Amino acid sequence: FEILNRVLFDAPGAPVKKALMDAQIGKDIQSSYDNGIMQPVFSVIAQEARDDQEDEFVKILEKNLAKIAKEGIPRRNLLAAFNYYEFKYREANFGRFPKGLMYGLQMYDSWLYDDEKPFIHIKTNEIFKQLREEIENGYFENLIKEYLIDNNHKTIVVMKPKKGLQKIKDQEEADKLKAYKDSLSEEEVKKLVEETK
């Protein structure tokens, strides 16, 4: 799915992201795949989209995914995604984080749910080889169809920010703390201050 995510959304000129951006759905489109949990999740997020764009977002997303699943993903796009991830894998550059720590965290992605396979997320080289062999037989197009188009476990979540909400919450908390402090005697306040130094 990381390969698909790269091809469909992350790579320069990625077709699904481009279609959503061309339709001016939100200010940016982001996607992610999280397989470090019991039930892996693939997400597509339209940042700062308007409420009335929800149906259009879903329609464009599904239409473009269906078109790509039917017509096929260009081989060079898949190979470019493989090259990108293989380079990252071989380079093993985790920035300021130690390699051992990052490898340990990667192991948890599978080890937490299957104690027989702690190294599955580290032994990626074999998987790259197997997946490269699948490029020609429609494997990736079938993944799109089965898991992104025909999946009955998908959901649409619209998050609506409320302007000034944090200020309201901060004021409520300040009022609550003031009321608590006012309920204490001077001696209780001093004791509390001493205990929390």
Residue ranges and their predicted role:
Residues K17-E133, N152-K162:
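M16 family metallopeptidases and their MPP-like homologs
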Residues V7-A11, A23-Q24, Y147:
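Generic structural signal for hydrophobic core residues of well-folded globular domains
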Residues F1, D55-E56, K167-E172:
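Short conserved micro-motifs at the rims of enzyme active sites and ligand-binding pockets
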Residues F1-G13, S43, P98-K117, H121, ...:
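His/Glu-based metal-binding/catalytic segments typifying zinc-dependent metallopeptidases
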Residues I120-K197:
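Segments forming glycine/polar-rich beta-alpha architectures that bind adenosine-containing cofactors
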Residues R6-V7, N64-A69, L177-D182:
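Short, surface-exposed linear patches
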